Amino acid sequence: AAVDVGAAGVAVYDPVESVGEGSSAARIDERVSDLSFVVDRLEADAGGIDELRGRLDLGRIGVAGHSLGGIAAAEMCADARVDACLNIDGQQIGGPFSARRDPSPPTKPFLFLTKETRLHPALVEVFEAAGADAYRVVVPAATHGAFTDGSRYEPRLLPVDGTADHVLAIERGVVRAYFDRYLRDVTGPLLDGLPAPTDIYAEVYPLRGRPTLPAG
């Protein structure tokens, strides 16, 4: 996208795709293809691999990713073989949680784990139109990089408040509770009974009587 200031001094928005946007969209598409390929190969070969035989339930598949990988995970909601998607702080490239301009809202359980306390209206609309349970978990202390273990080693990725281990502990608790619920049918106090779509501000627990996340 770009903004052009015309002769009258009025800024006119031009929705043309920027170079960076096009490059990021291509990288997301590549990740989605890779994820789909992994599922293809597991379906075709898992039974013949000794280390995997009997260990995988391919009837229950969840996908999670961070940043562009999070958008790719959201895109995988469109794959009929995927049961739940989790996007960690990947917002939009072409459209909300997508490399495309006009994506469809997720029809599978969807969780967005983010540092953002406020979302663009287009992202909010995705939650309002979601065809299944949709959650937004906000960790205000986090930075984009704090959701990765790189924050333990690179000072520029540290959270704005608290410690790297603190944010990672929240992330682990949310990811586990979400996939426990939607892949293993194991309910717990973090998500059980909450209306969907809903917001969980992880830093202000307890919420509606729910307990705080574990420290580790």
PLM regions and their residue ranges:
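Primarily recognizes the serine-hydrolase "nucleophile elbow" in alpha/beta-hydrolase
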Residues: 38-102
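Stable alpha-helical elements in mature extracytoplasmic
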Residues: 31-38, 72, 171, 175
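Alpha/beta-hydrolase active-site loop
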Residues: 12-58
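The feature captures the conserved acid-bearing segment of alpha/beta-hydrolase catalytic domains
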Residues: 83-144
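Divalent metal-coordination and catalytic microenvironments
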Residues: 35, 61, 136, 179
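Active-site machinery of serine-nucleophile hydrolases
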Residues: 1-18, 140
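Alpha/beta-hydrolase-fold serine-hydrolase catalytic core, especially in secreted/extracellular enzymes
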Residues: 141-143, 150-216
